[in-house]
Amino acid sequence: MRPPATPPDPTKEPGCKGTTRGLRKRGLPLTPEPGEGGGCSLEARGCEEESRQKQRMVTQASGREETEGDKLAKENGKITEAPSDDPQPGTDLVRKTSITSSESLQTVECSEFQNMAFLQSLDKEELGEGIKRRMRIKKCKSLENPPLEITKNEATQNIKVEFQDELFKNTPKHSCNSLSPGVEKNCSFELHDYSFLHSEGCNNENNFEDKPHDVCLHTEENSLKLKKENLRNLAEKDDTRTTTKLLKTEKSVIASKLLLEESHLYQNKNNGLTSCLQSEKNKYSVEENNTGRKHRKKMKSGKEEKNINLTLSNVCNNSVLVLQENQMGMEGKEAETLEPKKSFLKALRKINHNTLPPVDHLCLPKTVGKTSSRHHINAMLQKTLESSLKEDIKNTSESLGCKRIEPEKYNKSMISSTVKSPSDGHHMEKRSPRGDLRSETEESKVSCCRTIPMTGKRVWPFYSCARISAQCWKKTSLSDLNYSLLGPLENVRQHDSIIHQMNQTHLPDSKLLQPSLTERTTESSRKEMYDSDLSCLSSVSSVESTVMDIKEAMSHDKKTKLEEPSRNGAEVVSNATEDTQLSNITQSLTGNKKRKGNLSKLNLTVASQESQETNNCANKTVHRKVCITKQTLVAPDLVKILNTGRLTNFKIPLLKNKTGKRGAVSARSSEREAYSPLELLDSLSGVEAKQNRNKENICTTSGPQSLNLHSCIAPGQASSHSFYNKNSCTSSSFTKKGYDNKACNHISEPGNIISNKESISMKIENNTFSCDLGYIDQSSFCSKKQEAFVPISSEISGRKMTKSISELKLGFPDILKAYEDDVLLIDVIQDDPELFGISSEGDLSFASEVSKISQEPRVSEDQPTADFKHMHLPGKKEPGDLSKEVALLDPGLLKLESCPSLSAAKEPQHDPEGAAISLEATEETVVSGSLEGLSEQARASDSDAKCISSDKATVMEEQESTHEIFKSKDSRNVESATECQLATLGPNPLCSSALPVNLSSHQDVVSTPWINDVRFPGRHSVLQLQNPETCEIFKREKNMGVFQKPLGLLIPHRYCKLHFNTLRGCERAQCKFVHVPEQGDEKICMDVFRKYISVNEQRLLHRAAYIFLEYYRKFPPGIHFSLQVLNDLLISLLKHCLLKEVFQVVQLSIMAKMLPALKILLKIFEYVAAMKLRNAVPALIEIFCKFIEAGMVPDPEHLNYIVKLLHQAQASQQEISAVLQAKSRLRVRQLKKNWKCDLDSALSEVETCKEKSDWTKLGNLYISIKMSCEEFADLQRFCACVAETLTEDYKEERPGVPFCEFAETVSKDPQYSEVDKTLLGRIGISAVYFYHRLLLWAKGRKVLDILYELKIHFTSLKGLTGPEKEAPRCQIVNVAAEIFIKSGSLDGAIWVLRESEWIINTPLWPCDRMDVLNRHNLLCTIAHEILGKNLYKQTFEVLRNLPSFQNSQEMMGVSQSSLLFNELLDACIESNSLGISSSVAEFMVAKSIPIDFSFLRRLITSLGRSCLWLKARAHYKSALSLGCYPPLEGNLHRKLLLVPSYLSEIEMLLAMEIFLVSNASGIQSAGMGAPTQVLQIVLKRCEESKSRSKDEYQAAVERLVMAARISDPKLFIKHMTVNINKEQVYSLEHCSALKWLKENMKWAGKVWLFTNH
C-alpha cells in the first residue's frame, strides 16, 4: 500500500491533474485519498484493511482488473475531486455516507480484486440469470407499482440490506470498512462525482473495453461466484450479523459511491481521508497510469492489453461494487430486511448470465471485472441498487420537489454512478490519497489527449485513434452509454458528476461547491427523472444489461428505460444479463478493443453526462447524453467504441474491426458519427450504418432543436436522444445541452420518457434513428407538449432519414483516411490540425443540417429542476467572437453552431438551473483536465445562465448577452466551462455552438468543442495552438474555406469570400481582401443583403448591417439601391431583436435620403412598446422626427397609434408632446398639400365668397391659406385681395360689415397669432378708409370697434390697398378719430389719439401740413366738445397735444388755442377746479398763451382763499411779471406802499408781504435801537373807482384791514390821515411787522426777493 499522500489543495488541482495524467500514462491505478475515509468508524477501518488485503490478492490475481480498477479509481478520483459547494438538505447525511462508502469502497475494492478470480470462476450463467430475473422482477414491479418511490424505497432498502449482507459475507474483510456517516452524507455529491466517475470511467471503461468480452466473462463468473458465496454466507449468517454487515456494507457502498463524490468534497472539505484511500488510489492510479502509457505507446501485447482490460474491469467492478455497496449501505440502513438479498443475487445472476454491453462494461463490466468479493459486492449492489434505484428514483422525484434525497433515490443515483464507474470509485479511493493522481485521472477522463511534454499539452480529436481516453467523450460517451442503459436518471447523475468533475478540474473554486448542493441538484433532477421514469426503474437493470433488454423494457414500459438508466449504476450487472442484445452488440464492438474501450468511456461519459444533465436541469447534458445513449442502444458496438476512450493496447483499428472502437471516437467528433464509419460498417449494415450516421448528423444538426426538445424530454427521452446523438457525435453533445435543460425540466413527466423510449426501442431494432430524430424534432417543436413527441419524431425521423447514404456519408471523414491521419498524428505530428478538426465534408454536412434544424422552432424551457447556487457564470462574449472561437475549435461545427445558435437565439428559452448545471459540469470537467471542453461548456452554461438572468421581454438583450458570454475574454470561468464542455460534448460541438447562441435554451448556449486537451490562456475559450506550424496549417485550412460552407454568392476576386460568402465570416487578423464593397459595387451590396436576409441568420444580419453602414457612410445610394431590400433588412433585424442595428441603419438611411417604409417605423414602435424598452424611446423619437423632417407624412391614424404605443412604452410627456407637435406640423403640411399652395385658386375662392357674401368662409379660407403658404409675400397678396373684397362689397341695404365677420372667424383660429393681428389690422385700415371716404361713420366705427376688441394696434400699421397703403400715421389716426367723432364717440377718438400717442409728425412717421392742420382742427373740435361736457382734464389733454405745442415750428392755430385755454381756465375757476386751473394757467404762462388777467386774478384769489398760498404767490408773481398789477411805486426806502383799492384781500396781503420783505432791514434795525421809520400804506383810489360810490372804497378799506388780520402773525395797521386825493393812509405797527419778519422771513425772502418783478 502506498503511504497516504496529503490531500491536494483545491488550488493545486491543476497540478494534481498533471500528476494524474502522468499516472494514467503510466497506467498506474489511482488510489483514493484516505482523507475521504477520515470519517470511517473503527469497524469501517477494519473492513478497509481487509479490503486492502483482498485488493492485494486481486491485484496479484489479475493485472487486467487492476488496470481497469485504476481507471475506475481515476474516475473515482475525479469524482472525489468533484466540487461540492452549497450543500443542500440532506447533504450532511449523504456526505457521511459517501465517506463511509469511500472506506468500504476501498475495502470492497480490495475484496473485489481478491475475489476477481473467484467471481470469474463462479457460474457465469447462473449468476447472470439470477440477476436478470431480479432485474425483470424489478421491471415488473416498476410497471405494476407506479408509485415506485415507496415500493422502490422498500425494495431498494431490502435489496440494499440483502446485498450488503451478501456483500459483507462475500467480502467480510474487505467490506468491513464502512465510511462514517459523513461519507454517507456525501453520497449525493458522490452521485455527482459518479457522474464524473463515469466520465473518468470512460477512460477506465475504455481500458476495460480493451477486452470487454473477458471483462464480461470475469464479471459473470465473479458475479456467479459472488452470488453463490453470498448465498452461502447468507445462509450462514444470522440476521443480526447480517444486518450489521449489511449496514457496514451499505456504508461501504455509500462510501464508495460518495467517495467518488467525496473526492471532490475532499478537495473542498474532506482533507483527512487520505490514509487508506490514498494507498489504494495511488495503487490504482499507478496501474491506470501504466495503462495510459500502454495506450499511448500503443502496446500491442495481448497480455498487457488483457491485463489492462482486466484491471480496468476489476477497477470498474470494484468501483461499481463499492458504489453499489455504498448505495446498499445507505439503503440497508433504511431497510435492514434480508429479502433484498435474493433480488440482489438474482440481479447478480442476470449480470453474470448476460454479457454486458459496452455500456455495461462501462458501468457494470468495471464492477464485474473486479471479480472476487468486489464482484459479489457488485452483484449484491446491483440487486440492492435495483431496489435502491427505485427508491432513489422515488426519492429523486421527491428531491426534485425540493425534498431531501431518499435513500432509494440516492442509492439509485449512486448506483447509476457506481455502475458507470464503480471501479472508478475504487480507483478514486486509491487515488484520493494522491490529489495529483486524482486530478490526473479526472483530466485523463475528460481528456483524450496524451501526456505532452512540459512544453504543453496537445489536444486530440474525439474521433482520433490517437486518443487514449475520450476527454469529452469519457464523460459524454460514458454518460450517454450508461444513460442508455441506466436511463436518464443515472445518466443525469453521471452527467452531473461529470459536470462537477469538469468544474472541479477547471476551477478549484468549483470544488468548494458543496457536493451536497450538487448532489441535491442532481437528486432533484434525478428525482424528476425518476418521477418520469418511475415505471421504468424496475427495468433499469435489464436495460442496462443489454440494448435488447432496453428495447424490450422500452416497448413494454417506456418508463422502464428511464428507470433503468437511473438504476443503471447499480444494476449494470443485471442489466448486462437482460440486455443481451445490447451486450452482444457491445461484445461485437468489443471485438475492436480500441473502439470498445472508447465506447465504454463514451458510455460512461454519456451516462454521467446524462445524469449530470438531469441533475443540472440544463437538459443540454441530458440531451447529449440521451443522444449518446440512443446511439448506444442502436449500435451497442458504438457504445463500445464510445467507451474505448482508453485502451491498454491501443491499436489503429482496421476497417473490419474499427466498427466498435472507431465508432466511439467518431461519435466523439462532432462531424463524425457517435461511432466511426468503420464501426458502422461492422456493427450495422452499410446502408443502415449510413442511415444511422445520417440520422446522427440530423440529430446533430437538429441539436439546437433537440436541445430545446431535450430540455422538455424526460430522461428516457434524453436517453434515446443521447443514443441517437451518439450515433451523430455532434448531436449527442449537442443534445446533451438540450437534454440538460429540458430533460431536467421534464424529467418528472414519465409520459415524455415513455414516448421517447418507445421511439428509441423501435428504432434501435431497425438500426434507424428516426425515433431519435423524431424525438429531437418533437422536442424542438413540442418541448412544451411532450405527448406530441412520438408522432413528430416519426415524421422528422422520416424526413431526416430520407437523406441519401451518400449525403450521410458526407458528414463523416473517410475512415481509412482518418485512420491514417490518426496514426500519423499520434506518432509523428504532435500538433497536427487533423486531431483538432474534422474533415471539411463532415463539417459542411453537419453545418448544413444543423443550420437547417437550427432554423426550426425551439421550445424554451422554463422548468428548472435543480437550483445550483454554487454555479459560476462564465464571462460574456460577443456572438462574433463566439463564432470565431468556435470556428477555431471546429470550423464546420462553427457553421452549424452559428446557424443553430442564431436561430436558437431567436427563440428565448429559459432554464436557469440547467444553465447552472451546465456551468457546474463545466467546472468539474475542468477539474478533469478537459480545458477546452470546459471552456465550451462554460460558454454554454454561461449562455444558459445568461438566459436565466435575462428577461423574456428582453429576448434580444438576452441573445446579445449569450453572444457576449462567448465573447468574454477575461472570463476564466468561461474558459474552463468551455473547455469542460469541449471535453464533455466531444463530437457535439456543432450543436453545442448552436445552442449557446440560443438564448432561450441554456443548453443551446453550450458550445461543444471538438478539441479536448487544449488549455486556454484565460482570454478566449478558443483553442490555443502552441505549435506555430500547426497554427499556420489551421489558419491555412480556415482561409481555404475547408471548414465553411459557401453561401452561394458570386463575389469578385478582390473581395473576401470568407467574409461575404460564409456564415462564420473571415477570421483573419489582417485580411488583405475587401470586407466592404467599393464604390460602384452597390449591386453586390444588394445581392449580399438579399442572401443574408434569405438565410435569416443573426450573425449574417449583423454583418449585413455592418456592410450597409460602412458602405453608405462613404457612398451615396445609386441606381442599384433597392428600398425593398432596405425594408426587408430592417424587418429581419427587428425580428432578431437587433434594435441597435435597426436604429443605426434607419438613421443612416434618413441621412442618405433613403426613407424606409412607414410600416417599418410603426413596427419599431410596436417592438419598443411590446418590450417596454423605455430607454429606447428617446432615440426612437429622434428617428421619428427625422422621418417627419425628411418628408414622411403619416396619417393621423398612424400618429394616434404611435402616441398610444408611446403610452404603452411609458414614455414621458415631453416625448409624447414631440409627436403631437409633429402632428400639428403635419396637419399644416397636409393643408398645404390639399390646397397645393395655389394662390390663384385661393383668390378665385375669395371671389366666390364675395359673391355669396360668405365672409365666414372667407375667414376659413384665410386660415387655410395662412397654413399652406410658405412665403409671407403670398399671404400678403392674399390678404390684399381679401381687403379689396371686403371694401368693394358695399351695399347700403346690408347692415353687417364684412370685415367684422371675417375678423371674428380668423380670431377664432387656435393658432391665432400676432401675424394674424397685423394682417387683420391692415385689412381693417383699408376698411376704415373705405368707410371714411364713403362717410359711413357707423360701419367705419364698427371696423374700429372690432379692431379695438381684438386689441389690434392699427394706428401703427398701414393699409394693404389704395392710398391707405402709403398713408402716414397721422392721417390714419385722424381718419379713425374723425370716424369716432362723427359717430359720436369722443372716447373712441381720444382712445385712437392716445393709442397713437398723439403723434403728429416725427422722423419715423412724417406727415404733411395738411395732416397737421387736420389734426389741429380735429383736436380743437374734440376739446371744444369735451369742454362742453365739463371734461376739463380731457380737454386740457387734447389742447395740450395740439400740433402747435408739439413742434415749435408749427404756430398755426395759436389764437384759436388761446381762446380754448382761457375758456378752459374760466370754466375750471368757475367749477372751482383749482388744480386744473392752476395747471392751465401755468401751461398758458409757459407757452406764452395770452391769458385773461381777470381769470388769473380770480385764480390767485381763489387759491389764497383756499389757503393754497404757494400756488397763489406763484401765480401772483407771474401776474406781476405779466403786468397784471401795477409796479411798486416809490422807493422802497421811502417806506410807502400803494395798494389799489380793486385788489382783493388776498392780493393786498401778498402786496404787504412783498412790502415787509423789501423793508425788512430797516424794520429789523429799528428794533436794534435805531430810529424807527414809519411804514405807510396808502389805499389808492382808482380812476375807475372814482366814479364808484363811497361804498366800494369803504369796502376796499375793510379788505385792507382784513388782509392785515389774515396775515400770520397778524399785522396791525393804524389810520393816520387822508391825503389830498382823499385816500386813506395807514401806518404799519413796527412791533407787528418785526414779529412777522422774524417768523416768515426765511420763506418770504426766498419767494419774493429772488424773483424778477
Curated annotation (Swiss-Prot):
Keyword Cytoplasm: yes
Keyword Transcription regulation found: no
InterPro entries linked: TOPAZ1, TOPAZ1_dom
Gene Ontology biological process terms from the UniProt entry: apoptotic process; ectopic germ cell programmed cell death; lncRNA transcription; spermatocyte division
Residue segments, region Disordered: 1-94, 284-303, 415-442
Expression tissues: Restricted to testis, where it localizes to germ cells.
Keyword annotations of the record: Cytoplasm, Differentiation, Spermatogenesis
Superkingdom of origin: Eukaryota
Name of the molecule in the record: Protein TOPAZ1
Effect of gene knockout: Males are infertile, while female fertility is not affected. Testis size is significantly reduced with the phenotype apparent from postnatal day 28 (P28) onwards. Testicular histology appears to be normal before P28, but then cell aggregates begin to accumulate in the center of seminiferous tubules. Sperm development arrests at the post-meiotic round spermatid stage, associated with increased apoptosis. Adult testes completely lack round spermatids and spermatozoa.
GO cellular component: cytosol
